[in-house]
Amino acid sequence: MPRLFLHTLFPVAALGLLLTACTAQPPRPAAAAGSPEAAAAPASAVGRYPVANAGQLVVVTASGWDATEGELQRFERDGMSWHRIGVPEAVSLGRSGLAWGQGRHAMPQGDGPIKREGDGRSPAGVFDLPGAFGYGPTGHSLMPYEAMDASDWCIDVDTSPFYNRIIDARQEGEAAVAGSSEPMRLDLHNAGDDRYALGLKVAHNPANVPGLGSCIFMHLWRRPGETTAGCTAMSDSTMLTLLSWLDPQRHPVLVLLPEAEYARLRSAWNLPAVQVSR
């Protein structure tokens, strides 16, 4: 049976890795705001108040739509107020910047491209963080965790019935993973590559709509500033701090936005004030 990408519980394990590939197919033209692609997320996945039930926020802001670096900040809710936890931490983003993704938010009208498969952009918006994953048998978090095996793949082929899902080739057959560029054990498929040793799943494109982007993660980086294919990458220490803090009982969500969009939406979405250290 395939494991739904948005609800699979992933393993958080070994240190020192970074997830980089979130989509790796050739880029396609960006969809315009208001297009059918922009409206593809189901009603249950969007809303005017996308952080209403969240008790923890992982906020990533970037200088603009084409920025490839950003800052990660953590917040906890106390009643109607948000309180910052810790200090801002550097992260790397998609090689082409950001684009509106499909998540908990209603698709805003205004500037910004729409996320497409292979565009090299990290999805912007508000997204659930369903769980963690990694190479080791145990995690470093209260978050649901699943250890990945050599036969586990995230399918980024948008013509596949398993698009945007984690599947086990031993169960679904080798043909089911043909053409995918996302083995979840990169170390076993790419000469010891440890980038996926520790990470978090980002619930982007919950309806698994073909072409709107797949296999989005938060993960470790190999070196500061190294861009991704659409994920958010960070240092080992930042990931471990994040994982040790996250609590599934508090409904953690990721908010990823350019600074101007964050400022525009802050009041309407009840977002906390962020610190800009640049």
What kind of feature is each model-predicted range?
Residues 234:
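A conserved hydrophobic position in a structured secondary element of the catalytic/binding core
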